[in-house]
Amino acid sequence: MARYNPRQERSLKRHSNYRDIKQSFLIICEGVNTEPDYFNAFRLTSASVKALGKGLNTIKLVQEAVIVRNEEQRKGHNFDQYWVVFDKDDFSNHDFNEAIRLAESNGFQVAYSNQAFEYWFLLHFNMYRGYIHRNDYEQMLSQQMKVKYSKKDYFTTKIYGMLLPYQPEAISRARKILAEFGNTPPSQAVSSTTVFKLVEELNRFI
């Protein structure tokens, strides 16, 4: 679940010279801290990541992502992969599904979570199926990690190493859960996440 932070953007670049790398990612995130900090923690050897936290949700985030992508291209920065990362939260089913459709129609891949990004973290520890309100995520994560979960700056960067040994299981669980929902619209697939797809892509370049 995204929270407003006066730091509206963070640009995270692995390399300054786009010509010297094999792959580049532009990741536009709903959350200002949690998601960008997490993706910044990936130690990529043959790719660059530019992750921006916008503090916007669903359709507005996708619209902003298109603007950012176009601005980057005008500067001569053409990325290999474009992603948006956002949550269902309490937004309407229509807005959530439409945001996914709009993103994909504009050339973005989508790493969504229903209900919130922290569900991806929970899957590192157990196979959590069914409805879990996002307000419970932080307490559940704190219990699992033996450290108080926080949305403050760089917290998810710090816990990346803690989560990493469990990442293969999280990917497997997220994929299995998503498959179980079949053709269920994303807005009704509670709980589920496609963050694992972005994680798998990033892992190709570690």
Can you say where each PLM-predicted feature lies in the sequence?
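C-terminal accessory helical subdomains adjacent to catalytic cores in phosphodiester-
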Residues: 2-26, 35-36, 40-52, 71-83, ...
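A broadly used, surface-exposed interaction patch
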Residues: 50, 54-72
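Helix N-cap/beta->alpha junction signal
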Residues: 30-32
